[in-house]
Design a protein with these regions (language model features):
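N-terminal metal-binding scaffold of metallo-dependent hydrolase/deaminase domains
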Residues: 1-40
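Hydrophobic/aromatic beta-strand patches that form the interior of the parallel beta-sheet core
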Residues: 5, 44-46, 58, 91, ...
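Active-site metal-binding motif and surrounding structural segment of the metallo-beta-lactamase
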Residues: 37-53
Length: 169
């Protein structure tokens, strides 16, 4: 099946076509041509006002059931849904059980998304057991792939805890 996108604005800062309007020809799910005016007998032609095309989007607040609540949603199902919705990157909240509060839990999440269309960027817990009392191993989790820290919807009353946490990252 072939699809022709007419006059699509390309949003991709790694491309020579960034913020430029072009026609895009897609054959069997693969972009085969990008040009000013493609005249092709495509199976489907989309000529929509304000059409934009990009590599993918990032969702900065995602919650899956796994680990711990797989009956709600598994990581693989969540990643499939994210990809089908156009998200190639997701920040996964630390609201699972066990909590994302150590190196191996961050590695587990990164490993689960390794060969998937959507990639997980874990938000790890700032404090052990989300208690707001003792910091987790922030440096270790950062080296494992955590991109942010927080105790998901729990207030951290000790501002020095936040300052120390920030200094460790």
């Amino acid at each position: 099946m072939s699809i022709l996108l007419k006059g699509a604005k390309i949003v991709d800062n790694k491309s020579n076509y960034n913020f430029i309007q072009k026609d895009i020809l897609i054959n069997d799910g693969v972009i085969t041509d990008i040009a000013d005016n493609i005249n092709s007998k495509a199976s489907k032609v989309l000529n929509l006002e304000n059409l934009h095309v990009s590599r993918g989007w990032m969702d900065t607040s995602v919650s899956f059931g796994e680990p711990g609540f797989e009956e709600r949603e598994t990581i693989l199902n969540g990643l499939y849904t994210s990809a089908a919705s156009g998200f190639t990157s997701i920040l996964l909240n630390p609201n699972c059980f066990p909590l994302i509060d150590n190196h191996s839990s961050v590695e587990f999440l990164k490993r689960k998304s390794k060969d998937q269309t959507s990639q997980i960027y874990p938000i790890a817990n700032l404090t052990i057991n989300s208690s707001g009392e003792e910091l987790t191993s922030l440096y270790d989790m950062k080296t494992a792939g955590a991109v942010a820290f927080g105790d998901y919807k729990k207030v951290i009353n000790d501002s020095s805890m936040l300052k120390i946490g920030r200094a460790h990252v």
